[in-house]
Amino acid sequence: MAAGRILVVAPNDELRRSLAFALEAEGYEVTARRELPYHGWVAEKAFDGTVLDQRALTGTEYESIAFCVKAHPVVLLAIRPHSWLVEWVSDIVEMPVIGNAVTSALDRAIVPAG
């Protein structure tokens, strides 16, 4: 069973709740947000990983990249990922999400300490 503190950012209520439920069932401790939180808050919380719906990125490219750097490792959920964002995320899961694609991507992205 997985373990770790995960931030989920998705503007769609159903998707956000579904992701939180699935990740909690896998053993993750989940904090879910509708919008991107401030970078300082993300750094302070020191999450083990982030699941990010690309539709939550409403700012500039620079702001989106800065968030991905602070929230690393990031698993991006997208129908068509922004080409400028691809190198700043750990993994990409195509939408619609099928099966355990998100948990598998998180398992690959999160490197155990030690």
Model-derived regions, located:
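Conserved phosphotransfer microenvironments
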Residues: 16, 36-41, 48-71, 79-82
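Local beta-strand N-terminus motif with an aromatic residue
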Residues: 47-48, 89
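CheY-like receiver
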Residues: 41-42, 105
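Two-component/phosphorelay signaling modules centered on CheY-like receiver
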Residues: 13-31
